[in-house]
Amino acid sequence: MIYYNGNDIVIRDLQQSDAKILTAEENAQGWNTDISKYEMRLKHQAEGRSISLVAEYKGNVAGYINVYPESEWGSFGGMGYSEIIDFGVLAKYRRRGIGSKLMDIAEQVAEKYSDTIYI
């Protein structure tokens, strides 16, 4: 699903092909990332437990964020609140409004499920 389609930025659901791209890009910029993180997000998305969003910038995967409508974790886990977690923009795409747009869309998605959102 596409949540936002602007001039250079598209926000859409995480796809299987994104997992390898994000893992490789994060490792290239010095982050110690394993593909299992994205495989878990894809599994949770398929189970209906989360909405995992990806930002594309000019057609390239540039960032991600995850919404758990009824999070099980954290201080408010199990209380029916939406949680926004695991938010990142690849270094080479920063300072272009991608992170702001990802957070805006994640908040819009989260508030469909709960009046209270935590990060």
Where in the sequence are the language-model features?
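Conserved beta-strand in the GNAT
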Residues: V54, N60-P69, E83, G88
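Hydrophobic alpha-helical core bundles mediating ligand binding, dimerization, or RNAP-core interactions
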Residues: A19-N27, Y38
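Conserved acetyl-CoA-binding loop-helix of GNAT-fold acetyltransferases
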Residues: V89, R95-Q108
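Short coil/loop residues immediately preceding or within conserved phosphate-binding loops
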Residues: S50, M79, I84
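Active-site rim helix/loop that mediates acceptor-substrate recognition in acyltransferases
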Residues: W31-V54, Y64
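A short beta-loop-alpha structural element at the N-terminal edge
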Residues: G6-L22
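A short, polar/charged loop-to-alpha-helix boundary motif
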Residues: S71-G78
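Conserved GNAT acetyl-CoA-binding A-motif
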Residues: A110-I119
